[in-house]
């Protein structure tokens, strides 16, 4: 027989749509709760891509690619105006 998992302990991908509003309200939105969520996300990323037995540069490349895309999105407003210029 399957044991019933409380809604608070379910992961986001395990929550049904009708349970989603109550699941969101059960989350911890205090600064320490948000910091803990970021810490858990960082730990998951680090253990999955960086701290592996046969490590490669792919985990660091993903961070660098995200940085490049983020920087481009931030500077897009300035780059947009220089796109059609013929001369300096």
UniProtKB/Swiss-Prot annotation:
Domain of life of the native organism? Eukaryota
Cite a single Pfam family from the UniProt record. WRW
| Keyword Ion transport carried by entry | yes
- Where Phosphoserine occurs along the chain? 3
Query: Residues bearing N-acetylalanine?
Result: 2
Transmembrane among keywords = yes
Q: Where found in the cell? A: Mitochondrion; Mitochondrion inner membrane
Membrane disposition: Single-pass membrane protein
Its main localization is mitochondrion
List the transmembrane segments. 62-79
List GO terms (cellular component aspect).
Answer: mitochondrial inner membrane; proton-transporting ATP synthase complex
Write the record's keywords in alphabetical order, separated by commas. Answer: Acetylation, ATP synthesis, CF(0), Hydrogen ion transport, Ion transport, Membrane, Mitochondrion, Mitochondrion inner membrane, Phosphoprotein, Transmembrane, Transmembrane helix, Transport
Query: According to the UniProt entry, which residues carry N6-acetyllysine?
Result: 16
What is one Gene Ontology biological process annotated in the Swiss-Prot or TrEMBL record?
proton transmembrane transport
Q: How does it assemble?
A: Component of the ATP synthase complex composed at least of ATP5F1A/subunit alpha, ATP5F1B/subunit beta, ATP5MC1/subunit c (homooctomer), MT-ATP6/subunit a, MT-ATP8/subunit 8, ATP5ME/subunit e, ATP5MF/subunit f, ATP5MG/subunit g, ATP5MK/subunit k, ATP5MJ/subunit j, ATP5F1C/subunit gamma, ATP5F1D/subunit delta, ATP5F1E/subunit epsilon, ATP5PF/subunit F6, ATP5PB/subunit b, ATP5PD/subunit d, ATP5PO/subunit OSCP.
User: Record's family?
Assistant: Belongs to the ATPase F chain family.
Give the function comment from the record.
Answer: Subunit f, of the mitochondrial membrane ATP synthase complex (F(1)F(0) ATP synthase or Complex V) that produces ATP from ADP in the presence of a proton gradient across the membrane which is generated by electron transport complexes of the respiratory chain. ATP synthase complex consist of a soluble F(1) head domain - the catalytic core - and a membrane F(1) domain - the membrane proton channel. These two domains are linked by a central stalk rotating inside the F(1) region and a stationary peripheral stalk.
Q: Under what name is this protein listed?
A: ATP synthase F(0) complex subunit f, mitochondrial
- Origin organism is Rattus norvegicus (Rat)
